Amino acid sequence: MSVSIIGVGLHPFGRFEISGREMGLIAAREALADAGLTWSDIDFAAGGSRDGGHADALVSELGLTGVPFISVYNGCGTGGSALLTASQAIKSGAADIALAVGFDKHARGAFATDPGEYGLPDWYAEAGMMVTTQFFALKLRRYLDDYGLDARLLAEIAAKALRNGSITPHAWRRKPFTADEIANAPMVNDPLTTYMFCSPSEGGAAIVLTSTERAREMTDRSVELRAIEFRSRQFGTFEVFSPSLAPAITPGATVDASRAAFESAGIGPGEIDVAQIQDTEAGAELMHLAECGFCEHGEQAKLILGGELDINGRIPVNTDGGLIANGEPIGASGLRQVIECVRQLQGRAGDRQVPGEPRTAFTQVYGAPGISACTVLSR
């Protein structure tokens, strides 16, 4: 049984004077309204949050209908795991209409994480590896050296993100910067400067799903979820909050998840019209582009400098500004990616609309400790 998306809702990302739960509620109600439904029509729900509260407790405001509501958490992949759980409920026949929701409200500053939560010893944190800016810079420096890539590409990626964010109503960072301004900004962890990173933020996102057959009866603008795949790390990969560093690095979870998603959907990266790629920092987008199959490792410069990733390019990436412009409320971030693709495929993306009526889309989210969720969508 195939599954389709019939409604989406998004609370803007940034900093707000309301709770994370309230943002999740706003997103859920918007998704229901977008689908032309009420909460009583939902017979399964899944959701997650790191710091915003318990997702299943949203029923207190949405309505005490007795609906099965599964709370999930997989770090930055939480939205992906919520969507996977909801879609599997439909595929199995356990549900007719399902809701996936994610939200968060993080404290200012970098994430503070206890290494013991990930089964890691204290020395890993004492070495500074629990500081994500330091970890990603270390991984990126090796990648740039291995493939002979110029660090200037990172400034170009961040400039694209902030340029797209400046025309996105729900984005947090709405001020564009040039690549020169970004490259010359204060260094955080070499080679990454201030504006190359995303920041923990706040927001909510929700998606309503049903079977593709039912969706066609309900609306003429449904988007098919052709594939959703979730993978964890294998031995030998170098991942955030995972201390393994083998001499020969094994392909990571993103490679496995993206390959599985494309195989399940029956199409390849070359057939994708618009994509949302995890950009925790600019280097993440650089690496994930190749891991997802959009180019070979070391060949990213052609895509980036040639404008092929721009909204008017051959394969527009992070059309709403990605994490760099939106920030990352962990529970909502992966669902935001999918919602952006849904709106692009429906022609509802406003000033950032990809031209030419895109028909296929791809999303990829990555998180600790080395997990990835990927989707393929189509109209």
Q: Each predicted region: which residue ranges?
A:
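Active-site-proximal alpha-helical scaffold in enzymes
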Residues: 74-104, 133-167, 207-213, 326-349
